[in-house]
Structures are given as C-alpha cells and as structure tokens.
A protein has these predicted regions:
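Hydrophobic h-region of N-terminal signal peptides that target proteins for export
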Residues: 11-20
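A glycine-rich, hydrophobic loop/mini-helix early in the fold
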Residues: 96-128
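Bacterial N-terminal signal peptides that target proteins for export
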Residues: 1-8
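Non-cytosolic coordination micro-motifs
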Residues: 21-98, 129-225
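Intrinsic-disorder/low-complexity regions
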Residues: 1, 18, 38, 103-104
Length: 225
C-alpha cells in the first residue's frame, strides 16, 4: 500500500515538500510534450472552437473527471496505478469541502505518466464555467529548461517572442534561462525556464479568452503615479 501512497503524493506535487529530490537527467527518459489539436467532433453543448491537447489535457475543453478513488478502512486514497486519462485530484480527499468544479483558479490535474515530460512537476488548471481555460505547469528549473524548450518548439513551432536571461544562484552559480511566448490563434503558451529559485520553472498554457482575462487583470493591478 505504501507505493500507492507515494503515487498520490507525486500526483499532488507533495514529494518535493517532504524532502525528495528530482531525479538526475540520466536517470529518466525524456518524454515529448503532447500538444495536438483537439478532436473536432464535439458534443452539442460544447463551444465550437478548437481546443489544444497539452500533456493529455484539453485546454479549452471540458473538465476532466476526478481521479479513481479506492476506499480503505478509515479513509480513501487515489488509485493512480492504472490511470488511462488525465484526472483532477484534491489533497483533502473527502474529509474537507469539495473543490469548486465550475470556477477554480488552481485545481490540481494529474496527467497520465506517458504524457508527463521529464522535468515537469505539479499541474494545476484554471477552470471557468466547468471548462479548462488554462494550465499552470511547474518545472524543475535549470535541470531540464533547455530540453523542455526544445520540445515546445517541436510542437508549437517558432516562438512569437524568444530570449534568454542569466540567473545567478544563491551560491554564485550562473545559469541560462530560456524564455519564450507562443501567441497562436487558438492557444497562448508562456515558457519560463527559471522562475525565482534556479530549480523552479513555469509553463503557462491559456485559451485566447483566458489570456485576455489575465492581461486585463494584470493591467488593473499595474501601479502608476
């Protein structure tokens, strides 16, 4: 049963908080990011615009189901041993209030292992009106920044905006952080190889509508004289 508990901790991004270290690049195989056009055959109650598949999650599509739950004596755990599609999960299981599945700024989503590229960590979704309008994918920073950037270019093409910045760690080590934005007709992707600490990076994936909301929010928070 301990291995199942470990899977749950990994899915919720909790392993890093209890002292586990990310595997070395030589210890894991790189997996390609899956960013494909969504199936154009949609149900009648879905919006007609095309969505994007990213890490097996449809950005612009309906919210995925909750991860499979296994009931145990005195509680329950998520059973991710035979996960076939992405699903959402919550850290408090059924002990606390259920998460808001209509509108949520940070709902944890668990991709299937074959859709999780090496170097990615916790994935959270922005849910608007029951649909996934955005994804926030945390990464391990400098360790796989350039590999992830290459994979994103393979799937999305040449970035709309591209650059690099030098980041210095607390002990004086210097790292190169790739930065890129893909502003495409049906998806917006912002990749930051290193954010804050050198072992932390970020990928933001938004629908055009969500990107417009984010831009408006940032503009409203901008301070001036």
């Amino acid at each position: 049963m301990e291995w199942r508990k470990s899977l749950v901790l990994l899915a919720l991004g909790a392993i890093g908080t209890v002292g586990a270290q990310a595997p070395a690049p030589s210890e894991v195989k790189r997996q390609a990011i899956s960013v494909e056009k969504a199936n154009t055959s949609r149900r009648s109650d879905e919006r007609p615009n095309t969505g994007f598949e990213f890490m097996g999650i449809f950005v612009g599509g309906r919210l995925v189901r909750e991860c499979p739950v296994e009931q145990l004596y005195g509680g329950a755990i998520y059973d991710l041993s035979s996960l076939e599609t992405a699903c959402w999960a919550t850290s408090n299981m059924r002990q606390g209030p259920r998460p808001n599945l209509r509108n949520n700024d940070a709902l944890t989503v668990v991709p299937v292992s074959k859709k999780r590229p090496t170097g990615t960590r916790t994935v959270t979704a922005v849910v608007e009106d029951g649909r996934i309008e955005g994804l926030r994918v945390e990464t391990d920073g400098f360790q796989h920044a350039h590999q992830l950037f290459e994979q994103l270019q393979q799937k999305l093409g040449k970035p709309t905006i591209q650059g690099t910045s030098d980041v210095v760690s607390g002990v004086g080590a210097k790292f190169s952080s790739p930065e890129a934005v893909w502003n495409l007709p049906n998806v917006y992707v912002h990749f930051s190889g290193i954010v804050g600490a050198v072992d932390s990076g970020l990928i933001l994936v938004y629908t055009p509508e969500q990107q417009a909301r984010e831009a408006a929010r940032q503009k409203a928070q901008t301070k001036s004289f």
